[in-house]
């Protein structure tokens, strides 16, 4: 807690996966850009993606032990209370030593002990939940939070307000029309042709690849071209057609989105948020692992009229030919979906989360 100074010290907690680290970094960057006086610290584990990404971005990473919630009664469950208490003590020490004014949690292993520690130190805390189905740390944290922000309407968290996803700057600032010619050049495709962008995430590509292998000729025959990120692991055969471009991965998603008119992809929270913020119609194939959060993320977009869904188990070349190809030919349906997507996604997620944090500090 600050004495006599007007600067604020923020502790952002989260990590483990890109889904937790990226929104955290977007908010950290927003806070840092707003004031050079304020201090932005990040709380994470040694094991998570944050251990590399946070220092790389120029933030100090404070460490907390990784203590997963027990899922079954076993030895780990028996040891959980002691290990969790230790993690809470670690965070309390960080809060006191750095005179933290507010804690912001993004889910993941670091968040649960951060919420408990903040309460015990009488420091306000804010919860941000990226998925339509919240994780356990955020379910528990939201009950006592000064403010809770969610990405998708209908996320079952106490007192939740829809604030959207804090997105990467290159997506927030993207002018798709202005970059389309450059994007066509980069990927070797014609910027004048309508383009279907297909990607499956690092793990989820195989199912999409198998379906596309049998469906791409029908898509091309319908007058479309395809940019398909097939992943490193899957040896998909590139048929060598000028209108069907297969690449292992895309490191410039801003340019891929600039070329795209429709997206076929998995339904991670960041993916759905970026596609919606850019007003792109989408067909989602939710990845059927984890606790079903992708299906719920996609359902939020479908309810709004911004997307369609094909369940993972039903994704075949025939299904793409019968469902995707007619949609690609329906200009009115696509423009309705594009208009609807602005109600699902926003480019203001970072600003909205920072406004929640400001509220918590001012209380």
Q: What would you call each of these model-derived segments?
A:
Residues 20-32:
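Short amphipathic alpha-helix
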Residues 7-18, 37-90, 163, 311-313:
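Conserved nucleotide-sugar phosphate-binding/catalytic loop shared by glycosyltransferases and other
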Residues 326, 346-363:
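C-terminal alpha-helical cap of glycosyltransferases
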Residues 121, 258-261, 274-285, 304:
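Conserved donor-binding/catalytic loop of nucleotide-activated donor transferases
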Residues 90-103, 111-126, 139-144:
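Glycosyltransferases and closely related glycan-assembly transferases
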Residues 119-181:
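Active-site-proximal region of nucleotide-activated glycan assembly enzymes
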Residues 333-347:
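A short, well-ordered alpha-helix in the C-terminal region of glycosyltransferases
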Residues 43, 48, 53-55, 176-185, ...:
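Donor-nucleotide binding loops and adjacent catalytic segments primarily
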């Amino acid at each position: 807690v600050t004495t006599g100074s007007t600067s604020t010290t923020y502790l952002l907690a989260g990590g483990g996966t890109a889904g937790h680290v990226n929104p955290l970094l977007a908010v950290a960057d927003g806070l840092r850009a707003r004031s050079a006086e304020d201090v932005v610290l990040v709380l994470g584990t040694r094991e998570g993606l944050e251990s590399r990404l946070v220092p790389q971005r120029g933030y100090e990473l404070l460490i907390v032990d990784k203590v997963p919630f027990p899922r079954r009664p076993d030895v780990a469950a028996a040891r959980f209370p002691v290990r969790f208490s230790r993690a809470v003590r670690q965070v309390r020490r960080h809060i006191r030593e750095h005179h933290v004014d507010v804690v912001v949690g993004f889910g993941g292993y670091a968040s649960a002990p951060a919420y408990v520690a903040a309460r015990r130190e009488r420091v306000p805390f804010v919860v941000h939940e990226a998925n339509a189905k919240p994780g356990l740390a955020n379910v528990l944290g939201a009950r006592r939070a000064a403010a809770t922000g969610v990405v998708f309407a209908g996320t079952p968290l106490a007192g939740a307000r829809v604030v959207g996803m804090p997105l990467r700057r290159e997506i927030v600032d993207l002018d798709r029309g202005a970059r389309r010619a450059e994007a066509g050049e980069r990927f070797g495709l014609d910027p004048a042709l309508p383009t279907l962008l297909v990607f499956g995430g690092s793990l989820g590509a195989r199912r999409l690849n198998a379906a596309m292998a049998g469906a791409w000729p029908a898509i091309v025959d319908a007058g479309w071209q395809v940019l398909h990120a097939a992943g490193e692991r899957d040896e998909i055969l590139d048929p060598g057609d000028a209108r069907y471009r297969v690449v292992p991965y895309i490191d410039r998603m801003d340019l891929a989105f600039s070329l795209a008119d429709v997206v076929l992809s998995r339904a991670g929270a960041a993916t759905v948020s970026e596609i919606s913020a850019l007003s792109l119609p989408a067909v989602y194939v939710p990845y059927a692992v984890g606790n079903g959060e992708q299906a719920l993320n996609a359902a939020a977009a479908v309810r709004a009229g911004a997307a369609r869904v094909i369940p993972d188990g039903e994704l075949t070349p025939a299904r793409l030919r019968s469902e995707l190809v007619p949609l690609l030919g329906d200009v009115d349906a696509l423009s309705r979906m594009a208009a609807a997507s602005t109600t699902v996604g926003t480019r203001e997620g970072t600003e909205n989360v920072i406004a929640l944090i400001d509220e918590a500090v001012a209380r």
